[in-house]
Design a protein with these regions (language model features):
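Structural signature of alpha-helical solenoid repeat scaffolds
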Residues: 11, 47-48, 84
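Residue-level detector of extended alpha-helical repeat arrays and alpha-solenoid scaffolds
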Residues: 3-6, 39, 76
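N-terminal interaction modules that seed assembly of large macromolecular complexes
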Residues: 29-50
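Ordered, amphipathic secondary-structure segments that act as subunit-interaction surfaces
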Residues: 76-82, 86-88
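Short inter-helical turns and helix N-cap capping residues of alpha-solenoid HEAT/ARM repeat scaffolds
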Residues: 34-35, 71-73
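N-terminal "cap/leader" segments of large eukaryotic alpha-helical scaffolds
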Residues: 1-29
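Amphipathic alpha-helical scaffolding segments comprising HEAT/armadillo-like alpha-solenoid repeats
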Residues: 18-31, 54-67, 89-96
């Protein structure tokens, strides 16, 4: 799948909130994708999912937090945003 096709697929997933929780493992796997654009979208979706299902994303919090030190500003911003959304859902989930 090309980056463009994958980004479009993630855009479709964005609109289908009922699928978010079941797609968490897939989204987490995209955190290692070569494209910053795809990783940024995955971070955003994990954050939004974590607001509603914080315990379901808990195991992925360390991977999300690792992007706070990324050289890419977009990935740092998305990671901080995701952690904030997850913490809003359940603060203990993001406590170190």
């Amino acid at each position: 799948m090309t980056e463009k096709e994958l980004y479009k697929e993630l855009g479709t997933l964005t609109k289908n909130r009922d699928q978010w929780e079941e797609r968490i493992p897939y989204l987490a796997s995209l955190l290692s994708h070569e494209s910053d654009r795809i990783r940024a979208k995955a971070l955003w979706l994990l954050g939004e999912t974590g607001l509603v299902h914080p315990l379901s994303v808990k195991e992925h919090v360390p991977a999300i937090a690792s992007f706070c030190g990324s050289p890419a500003a977009l990935l740092r911003e998305r990671a901080v945003n995701a952690l904030g959304r997850i913490g809003r859902g359940s603060f203990p989930v993001i406590e170190a």
